[in-house]
Amino acid sequence: YPTELTSISLPRMLAIRDMMPSLSNFGISDHSLGTSMAKVAVVHGAHWIEKHFTIDRDIPGPDNRMSMLPHEIREIRSFCDDFSKMSTGNRMEPTAAETDLRKIIVGRFGDNS
């Protein structure tokens, strides 16, 4: 404790996930410092993250040193929400904002398509 990032093998984690295609979801038990591993796991499809939580890393105990603080949980939650927004749908048509911007550019510089 804590797990060093150099001791984490993302390829091994993904290989284990791929060995069990019948599982409907997978997750990680993360004992590293910070939020990087949790975010990487989400990007690769993790449905759950197990991570210790504390309100004070100075409280005695073996897990507090590597436990997440409240602001780190909010950071991961925000990342998950943002990632979900970017990953939802299979839209190829321009958004309303892109269409409006195109009209401004075409109006100013002409249509060069």
PLM ranges: what are they?
Residues 1-113:
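Catalytic cores and adjacent flexible loops of soluble metabolic enzymes
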